[in-house]
């Protein structure tokens, strides 16, 4: 699918909207400006691709609102070369933004159909990440520890295994709450035994499913 001058112009307008909403990290804004969001949407939503809204992508999942992507990415405090675990590949849009930040991404998706679709999409765009299909609520221990971990689905609590897979000095950004709204948390691993936690606003995500998340069939713990 073409990334036209029209699309690029719409992205510039989106960047202005994000700035007006308080996103200040210019490197994050530049990364979002480089990612063709319309390519990640179903045809029915193409004309709305650069609105600051979330849209369905199948399997009960959504492509996140650009403000949410910008906010979470900013909270990570990324530097090029970092090793980042993304929990919930979804459409692949957030993963693309992370890759545009120059980090090494390991991304895991619970839903097989989305895993296959997003892997194919990102590879066709020339993005290089490590893709996995499985229970992201348990992380991806065999490739850890990670400098940063990002969860793109709402968890009922902070999974201990994610903290264990974080390097000392590392940051975990994860939305935690019920299935209606969550608090965005930023946890910093100061030492192996000391974790600091910040609350960074209210958001609404699809449920994180898995052993340390919500039950995929019943949507209960």
From Swiss-Prot:
One Pfam entry name: PCMT
UniProt keywords (A-Z) are: Cytoplasm, Methyltransferase, S-adenosyl-L-methionine, Transferase
As for family, the record states: Belongs to the methyltransferase superfamily. L-isoaspartyl/D-aspartyl protein methyltransferase family.
Q: Which PROSITE patterns match?
A: PCMT (PS01279)
Q: What gene is this protein translated from?
A: pcm
* Segment forming the signal sequence: none
Give the active-site positions. Answer: 64
Q: Which GO terms describe its biological process?
A: methylation; protein modification process; protein repair
| Its job | Catalyzes the methyl esterification of L-isoaspartyl residues in peptides and proteins that result from spontaneous decomposition of normal L-aspartyl and L-asparaginyl residues. It plays a role in the repair and/or degradation of damaged proteins.
Reaction catalysed?
Answer: [protein]-L-isoaspartate + S-adenosyl-L-methionine = [protein]-L-isoaspartate alpha-methyl ester + S-adenosyl-L-homocysteine
Question: Where is it mainly found?
Answer: cytoplasm
Known EC number: 2.1.1.77
- Name of this protein: Protein-L-isoaspartate O-methyltransferase
What subcellular locations does the record give? Cytoplasm
GO-annotated molecular function: protein-L-isoaspartate (D-aspartate) O-methyltransferase activity
Annotated InterPro entries: PCMT (IPR000682), SAM-dependent_MTases_sf (IPR029063)
Cellular component per GO?
cytoplasm
What the entry lists under HAMAP family is as follows:
PIMT (MF_00090)
């Amino acid at each position: 699918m073409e990334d036209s001058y029209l699309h690029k112009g719409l992205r510039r307008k989106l960047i202005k909207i994000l700035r007006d909403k308080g996103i200040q990290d210019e490197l994050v804004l530049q990364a979002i400006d480089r990612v063709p969001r319309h390519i990640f949407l179903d045809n029915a939503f193409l004309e709305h691709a650069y609105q600051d809204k979330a849209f369905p992508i199948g399997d009960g999942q959504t492509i996140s609102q650009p403000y949410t992507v910008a906010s979470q990415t900013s909270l990570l405090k990324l530097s090029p070369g970092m090793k980042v675990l993304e929990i919930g590949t979804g459409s692949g849009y957030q993963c693309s933004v992370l890759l545009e930040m120059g980090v090494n991404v390991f991304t895991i998706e619970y839903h097989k159909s989305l895993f296959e679709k997003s892997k194919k999409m990102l590879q066709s765009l020339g993005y290089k990440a490590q893709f996995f299909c499985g229970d992201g609520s348990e992380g991806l221990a065999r490739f850890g520890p990670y400098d940063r971990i990002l969860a793109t689905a709402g968890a009922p609590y902070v999974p201990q295994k994610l903290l264990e897979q974080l390097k000392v000095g590392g940051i975990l950004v994860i939305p935690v709450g019920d299935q209606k709204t969550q608090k965005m948390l930023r946890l910093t691993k100061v030492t192996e035994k000391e974790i600091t936690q910040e609350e960074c606003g209210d958001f609404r995500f699809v449920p994180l499913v898995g052993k340390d998340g919500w039950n995929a069939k019943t949507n209960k713990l």
